[in-house]
Amino acid sequence: MAISDWPEQDRPRERLIKHGAAILTDAELLAIFLRLGVAGKSAVDLARDMLNHFGSLHALFSASLDDFSQLNGLGPAKYAQLQAVLELTRRSLSEELQIGISLNSPQAVKKYLQLLLGGKPYEAFAVLFLDVKNRLIACEELFRGTLTHTSVYPREIVKEALTHNAASVILAHNHPSGSSEPSAADHSLTQALKQALALIDVRVLDHFVVGGKNVYSFAEHGHL
C-alpha cells in the first residue's frame, strides 16, 4: 500500500509537520527523503530494507554508489541527493564551529568530525586551526592514507599553523576499521606533534580519533 493511501495521521510527512522530526523512526525519516517506494513496497518499506541491508544509518551514509545501488529502487539520483544532504549537514556544523562558541563544546566538535571523517574508507588526518579566542580559522585534511595507515609529517602541520597564524590546534584522524581506540603509534604521534608545535608556541588542545559511531578524546582521557 502506498503511503498516500494510509490514514493521514500515520503518514510520516504529516506526523513530522504536526509533531516534529524527533518522534519519527529512522525508517520514517528515510521514507520522507525517498518520497516514493517501488512496486509492491511503500517508501517506508524500502527505507526499512535499506536499514536492514546496511545495518545502521552510519553504514548507509558511508556506502559507496555501487553498494547503495544494490537495492531495488536506489541509484545515482538518490545517492546524489543523500550525499548533498550530508554535505549540507557538514557545512551547517562547520558554520556553527566558525562562530567560535561551539569550540568550547567538545560534543559539537565531535559531531563535526564524525561527519567529516567518519565515512571515509581510508585513514585521513585533519587539523583544526584556532585563533587566540579558540575560534576556528580553518579545518584542513592534510594527510590521506590507506585503509590502515597514513603518514603524518609534523613539519607540514607546523608550516600550516604558521600560515594560518594559529594559536592552537585540534588534531583528528579516523580509523576505517570502526575502532576509536588510539594505537601506540597514535600516542607517539600526538606527543611528537605537541612538541613540534610547542616550538612555535602553538598549543595542541585535543586529538580526536573517529571510529564508527565513537570518538575518542585524548584530552578527556588525560593524555595531553
Swiss-Prot record:
Keywords from the UniProt entry: Hydrolase, Metal-binding, Metalloprotease, Protease, Zinc
Name used for this protein in its record: UPF0758 protein mma_2551
Keyword NAD set for record: no
Xref: InterPro entries: MPN, RadC_JAB, RuvA_2-like, UPF0758, UPF0758_CS, UPF0758_N
SUPFAM superfamilies with a match to the protein in the record: JAB1/MPN domain (SSF102712), RuvA domain 2-like (SSF47781)
Domain MPN span(s) in chain numbering: 102-224
UniProt-listed PROSITE patterns: MPN, UPF0758
NCBIfam families assigned: PRK00024.1, radc
Residues at which Zn(2+) binds: H173, H175, D186
Motif (JAMM motif): 173-186
Family stated for the protein in its record: Belongs to the UPF0758 family.
One term of GO molecular function: metal ion binding
A matching Pfam family: UPF0758_N
Xref: Gene3D superfamilies: 5' to 3' exonuclease, C-terminal subdomain, Cytidine Deaminase, domain 2
Biological processes, Gene Ontology terms: proteolysis
Species name: Janthinobacterium sp. (strain Marseille) (Minibacterium massiliensis)
